[in-house]
Every structure is written in C-alpha cells, then in structure tokens.
C-alpha cells in the first residue's frame, strides 16, 4: 500500500531490479472524521496515513453532491450531450467535459445544476494529491500493477454512515481517474474499524445490515457515474477476533477508598466509596485503556459472588496511576484476594500490543473449546527476557 508520493518510484525501482511487477494500492485520506479517539482516527488530513483526496483548502462541501444524486443525469443515458474529443495537454477541468472524460457538455442548456456540481466535484478531485499519485503509479505500469485504492477511516466506529461517505468519495476518485486516464481501478479496500461491544451499554455494528446499506450506496453512485462497480474489500479483524478473547487476572488486593462529596460515577450519580481491585496484570498486557481511554467490564470467574455489589475500579500492578484495566464496574461486594477476574472482548489488540514494560512477563494464550483446551502461546519466562541480554 502506497502511503506517500515518493513511494511509487522507489517501489518501481525495486520491482525493476528484481524483475517483478508489484501489485500496489494507494491509501487515500478521504477527509472523513471517524473513530472514537484521535489516535485511531486515520482519514483526516493532519496525520501520518495516506495521501489527501482534495487539495489543501478545497471546499469539501462540494462533495455533498454525492448525497443527493436525484438531480444528476445518469451517465450513458440520452442526456450524453458532449461529442467533442479531449486533446492532450488540456486542463483536468476541460477534459472532464468530454466523452469518457465527462459525459456532458456543461454549457448545454439541458444540463442540470446537479450535473454542474458533480463536474465541479470531479474537477476538485482531479486537482488533488491522490489523483496525482495515482497517475505516478500508472506511469510505472510496466513494473507496477495498480490494483486500486485503500481507505481506512478509523477504528471501533459505531456510525456506519461514515463508511458510506468514504465509499462514495472513493467512487468519485475512481470515476475521476477514469476520466483523466481512462483506467478503471478494479478494487476499493474500505479497511476495518467496525465497532464491537466492550461493555454492557455498547452495541456491535450489525455488519449484515450495514454492509447491505453500503452496497446499495456504492451501486447507486456507480450507476449514476456510469462506472462498473469495483470489488469492495473489508478488513473486519477486530469485529471478528475481539469477542473471542477473555483475559483472566488474579486479584491481589482489594482496597476501599473513601471519596469526597463531589465524586460521581460515569452515570453522574454521587458516590462516597470506590473499591480498588488490584490484579496481577495491567497495561503491559492491555495498553488500550491507558492509551485510548478504552472501556472494558469484568466478572468474577472462579465462583458466584454475592448479590450485593460495590463500585469498583480494576487496576494493574504497574507503578502508574493510569494503569487501569476497567475504569468503572460493579462487582460483588465480597470480592477478595485470590479471586479470578474475567475481562471479556480482549481478543483484538490485547496480546498483540502486550509489552515487557517494567520487565513484566507476557501471559500465555490458551485456546478453549467445548471439549478441549490447549496452550497456543506459552507464558513468557524470566529466561526469555534474559536471552535478549548480551553479557559480553
């Protein structure tokens, strides 16, 4: 995946040296702001990923024409009015008015306002950095196979409309590239980021429903643009894997802390006491709460607790006030040292983000089925850590 303008030439040089033809996609930042935390929002312009769809300072509201296509004449219909051929060296704006370049003579009195807005949006995209890099990749087509574009907008996104907006913008880029270079991008990868429920108050994205909505939107946009629909790819890693993982912790200490009268829980209710439940893990095996403010829940796993509950905060063993695993959860009032706490939905970005912070050992991973359990990844040992040290 190409992430910046200088990469195509470097990849082309390597491919030529190896006698290969590399398959590449361009990662495009669509300008869609999505994702619950700044660190996992990846489609706005001021971050490290991808190449911007629009020029700096462009009026992104012009892309809103994609939200109301009723006033846009379907390409390839009887309203195809422009018959002139574009010539090499013409501006992108002028080329968009011709034949495959753009199916309308925009000066014709029968052209709707929607048609004009669509031509304006395409012109703006044609002047953007993303199209320039697509052209650069296409220029090396002898050693680079341009597979398509990639648009990952963020992580743990609850609003499926954000994916639809990003998809529409990629369809417009695809149409514009066809208009300027007569090349049809075969694939659009919309990445991942589909939400999962980490706590009782959250919902997982209904992929069946939302992907059906997205498919309808993509079909409609391409029909109006006169383009064949591309292959649409997705990367639902978190949505697939996160619910399969549960992390088990052993309780070390249980410490009630009296709070001032101004303290409140996350629902806004006043609280006078919070119980700090310290366990034998923490930010070394799950950094997400400290890094992103991610929320989890917990349950006692080794026995049935009392019906009475207390407001608790599950914290880790590291010397950090921010070493919090579950910020707020009601646990049985009789929780005690030695209990096992289960924290669900840790199958994604738990073990893979684990570290040896403070020389902590990374725990084992055990696969469990109805009939069997076996160790998939063994527990790290002190000897494992020492193996990295050079004694000479």
Question: Where are the model-predicted features located?
Answer:
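Charged (often Lys/Glu-rich) extended helix/loop segments that serve as interaction or gating elements
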Residues: 219, 223-392
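Anionic group-transfer/hydrolysis microenvironments
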Residues: 5, 29-31, 152, 191, ...
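Glycine-rich and small/hydrophobic secondary-structure elements
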Residues: 205-222
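Active-site-proximal beta-alpha core segment in soluble small-molecule metabolic enzymes
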Residues: 1-82, 88-187, 196, 217, ...
């Amino acid at each position: 995946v190409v992430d910046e303008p200088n990469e195509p030439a470097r990849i082309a040089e390597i491919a030529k040296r190896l006698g290969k033809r590399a398959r590449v996609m361009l990662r495009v930042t669509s300008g869609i702001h999505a994702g619950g935390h700044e660190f996992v929002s990846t489609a706005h312009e001021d971050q490290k990923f991808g190449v911007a769809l629009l020029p700096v300072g462009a009026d992104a509201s012009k892309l809103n024409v994609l939200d109301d296509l009723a006033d846009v004449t379907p390409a390839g219909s009887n309203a195809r009015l422009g018959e002139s051929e574009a010539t090499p060296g013409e501006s992108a704006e002028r080329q968009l008015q011709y034949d495959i370049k753009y199916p309308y003579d925009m000066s014709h009195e029968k052209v709707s306002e929607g048609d004009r807005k669509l031509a304006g949006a395409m012109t703006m995209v044609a002047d953007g950095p993303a199209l320039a890099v697509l052209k650069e990749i296409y220029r090396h087509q002898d050693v680079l196979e341009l597979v398509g574009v990639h648009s990952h907008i963020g992580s743990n996104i609850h609003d499926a409309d954000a994916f639809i907006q990003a998809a529409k913008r990629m369809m417009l880029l695809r149409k514009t590239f066809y208009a300027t270079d007569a090349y049809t991008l075969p694939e659009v990868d919309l990445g991942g980021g589909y939400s999962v429920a980490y706590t009782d108050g959250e919902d997982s994205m209904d992929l069946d429903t939302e992907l059906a909505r997205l498919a309808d939107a993509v079909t409609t946009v391409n029909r109006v643009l006169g383009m064949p629909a591309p292959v649409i790819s997705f990367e639902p890693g978190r949505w697939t894997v996160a619910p399969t993982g549960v992390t088990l912790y052993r309780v070390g200490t249980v410490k009630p802390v009296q709070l001032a009268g101004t303290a409140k829980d996350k629902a806004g209710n006043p609280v006078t006491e919070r119980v700090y439940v310290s366990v034998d893990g923490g930010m070394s095996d799950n950094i997400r709460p400290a890094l992103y403010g991610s929320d989890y829940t917990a349950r006692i796993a080794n026995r049935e607790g009392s019906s009475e509950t207390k407001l608790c905060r599950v914290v880790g063993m590291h010397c950090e006030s921010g070493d919090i695993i579950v910020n707020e959860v009601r646990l049985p009032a009789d929780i005690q040292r030695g209990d096992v706490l289960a924290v669900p939905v840790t199958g994604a970005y738990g073990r893979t983000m684990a570290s040896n912070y403070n020389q902590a050992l990374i725990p084992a991973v055990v696969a469990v089925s109805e009939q069997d359990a076996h160790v998939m990844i063994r527990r790290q040992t002190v000897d494992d850590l020492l193996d990295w040290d050079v004694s000479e």
